[in-house]
Structure formats: structure tokens, C-alpha cells
Curated annotation (Swiss-Prot):
Belongs to the bacterial ribosomal protein bL17 family. It comes from the Bacteria. GO terms for cellular component: cytosolic large ribosomal subunit. This is Large ribosomal subunit protein bL17. Part of the 50S ribosomal subunit. Contacts protein L32. PROSITE patterns: RIBOSOMAL_L17.
Length: 129
């Protein structure tokens, strides 16, 4: 029985799930918007939001903890140099999930997940895609 077990399995084993969310978190931090399935977007929010909260206090220990969770130096640098100061006054709710229809082929519900206060230039690039 799976009583009180949180998180979605997404038809993957635990190491695959961990690697997938590591990669998706790095992509979201670098591009500030990504398109994925709705359940993955909802789970990714649980990974990315604590990372941004961690980046609000720039210390060596927090940088090492963020690196342990993402395994990407560029992601850690952007988190602490750009996103931490940008979201310093916001107490959570750093991401937004926008539904965008269904995928051709398997009819999976798709969604954009984006950072809330991203620059408008990036918004124009996303609509061009």
C-alpha cells in the first residue's frame, strides 16, 4: 500500500526520476521557461522552488548544497548571482505553470513552467517558438 507517500512515480525508477528532475531544473534555471507534461511540471516545481529559496542567502554551504542537488556549476552560478537577488523580496511562489493543450501522438496534457519575474525579452522568444 502506498499510504502517505508523496510525489509522482511517472513510470520511472528513483534514480531515473532524480536525474530527470536534475536536468529539468537546470534547464528551467538557464532558460527560465520550458515546455513539458503537466505532471512533470507540477513535480518540477517541488524541486526548483527550494533551490531558489536556498539561493536567496549566498554562502559557501548553500552553494555546495545547491551543487549537490543540481550537479551543474552554471546552474549554481545563475541561481546565486541572478535568481537569488531577483527573488529576494518574494516569499515563495517563484514558478508559474501554464497549460498549453495536448501533445500530438499520445494526447498528454502539456504545460509551460516558467519563472515568475523573468524579463519580457524572454517572453517574446518563447512566443516565437
Amino acid at each position: 500500500m502506498r499510504h502517505r507517500k508523496s510525489g509522482r512515480q511517472l513510470n520511472r525508477n528513483s534514480s531515473h526520476r532524480q536525474a530527470m528532475f536534475r536536468n529539468m531544473a537546470s534547464s528551467l534555471v538557464s532558460h527560465e521557461i520550458i515546455k513539458t507534461t503537466l505532471p512533470k511540471a507540477k513535480e518540477l516545481r517541488r524541486v526548483v522552488e527550494p533551490l531558489i529559496t536556498l539561493a536567496k542567502v549566498d554562502s559557501v554551504a548553500n552553494r555546495r548544497l545547491a551543487f549537490a542537488r543540481t550537479r551543474n556549476i552554471e546552474t549554481v552560478a545563475k541561481l546565486f548571482n541572478e535568481l537569488g537577488p531577483r527573488f529576494a523580496q518574494r516569499a515563495g511562489g517563484y514558478t508559474r505553470i501554464l497549460k498549453c493543450g495536448f501533445r500530438t501522438g499520445d494526447n498528454a496534457p502539456m504545460a509551460y513552467i516558467e519563472l515568475v519575474d523573468r524579463p519580457e525579452v524572454a517572453a517574446e522568444e518563447a512566443t516565437a517558438e
